[in-house]
């Protein structure tokens, strides 16, 4: 789910991140991006 995506995100400060994107899509969202080192899912 979405929360596990955030936990997983050791990602860059901004921008696209593959693992985060994949996780968000599995959670039913359109995409995932990084905001301040955290994964953010975009519905």
Swiss-Prot record:
One matching Pfam family: Toxin_17
Give the transmembrane ranges: none
Tissue specificity note? Expressed by the venom gland.
Which controlled-vocabulary keywords does the entry list? Disulfide bond, Ion channel impairing toxin, Knottin, Neurotoxin, Potassium channel impairing toxin, Secreted, Toxin, Voltage-gated potassium channel impairing toxin
**Gene Ontology cellular-component annotations:** extracellular region
UniProt remark on domains? The presence of a 'disulfide through disulfide knot' structurally defines this protein as a knottin.
Q: What is this protein called?
A: Potassium channel toxin gamma-KTx 4.13
Source organism (scientific name)? Centruroides noxius (Mexican scorpion)
Q: What is the lineage of its organism?
A: Eukaryota, Metazoa, Ecdysozoa, Arthropoda, Chelicerata
